Amino acid sequence: MAAKSFDVVVIGAGPGGYVAAIRAAQLGLSTAIVEREHMGGICLNWGCIPTKAMLRSSEVFHLMHRAEEFGLKATGVDYDLDAVVKRSRAVAKQLSSGVSHLVKKNKIAAVMGEAIIPAKGKVKVTTDKGIEELTAKSIVLATGARARELPGLE
């Protein structure tokens, strides 16, 4: 299979990567984005956004217990942790779908898989369907970061 050629290939579709890809496309550059898991990255899918959705549920729960301060009555106030988690996942999924929509709207080629850079200007992506080869004048690394694991904190 022949390599697909682009002006820019962005590796990583988190908040840095998808914004870089969208801007490149808006500037008229042929652009591809490679993501190994979910559009939007860790923050959108597993960290910041779902956590804030769960915190909002907690805030509402707290406010409901203070209803009488506002001249309201709320009896039998309780929570369902499974439903709270389900809502947080739904919020993340909706926003991830929004990122996918922006990628598509800006005519960015999205490739789901794990990327390596075997040579200058070349990106090899292992997808569910095999190996996909891309070439690019520029490659943007937007793979995010992971916290260092400290010995003894297992």
Could you describe each region identified by the protein language model?
Residues 18:
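Residues forming the Rossmann-fold NAD(P)(H) cofactor-binding site
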